[in-house]
Curated annotation (Swiss-Prot):
PANTHER family: 40S RIBOSOMAL PROTEIN S11 FAMILY MEMBER, 40S RIBOSOMAL PROTEIN S11-RELATED. GO terms for biological process: translation. GO terms for cellular component: cytosolic small ribosomal subunit. Part of the 30S ribosomal subunit. This is Small ribosomal subunit protein uS17. Gene3D superfamilies: 2.40.50.1000. Keywords: Ribonucleoprotein, Ribosomal protein, RNA-binding, rRNA-binding.
């Protein structure tokens, strides 16, 4: 297992995935984001982030949601409902430019 230079808890399982930042050759650089896993299919997970924006015209706050596709390595195995930390990497496919780095908690147990 290699050190990726980011302060996250490394996975306990091993994997043979080339696109794993811990066991493969994928480098992580750029943004680090946190969100909830909404859907998992194959090696891809859909991460939903909830953003709160201030609207000056109405002097109120508005909730917005954004969805990102992230690579889900076999050693991490994030499931729907998990709160995860994702990191930006090179484009893995047409829509995936992020990889899941760690599972922080579950939907009912936010940390």
């Amino acid at each position: 297992m290699r050190d990726i230079g980011i302060d996250v808890k490394p996975p306990e399982r091993e994997c043979e995935d080339e696109n794993c930042p811990f066991h493969g050759t994928l480098s992580v650089r750029g943004q680090l984001l946190r969100g909830k896993v909404v859907k998992v299919y194959g090696k891809t997970a859909v991460i939903e982030r909830e953003l709160i924006r201030y609207v000056p015209k109405f002097e109120r706050y508005m909730k917005k949601r954004s969805k990102l596709h992230a690579h889900n390595p076999r050693c991490i195995r994030a499931r729907p409902g998990d709160i995860v930390t994702i990191g930006e990497c090179r484009p893995i496919s047409k829509t995936k430019s992020f990889v899941i780095l760690e599972v922080v908690g579950n939907e009912g147990n936010k940390s």
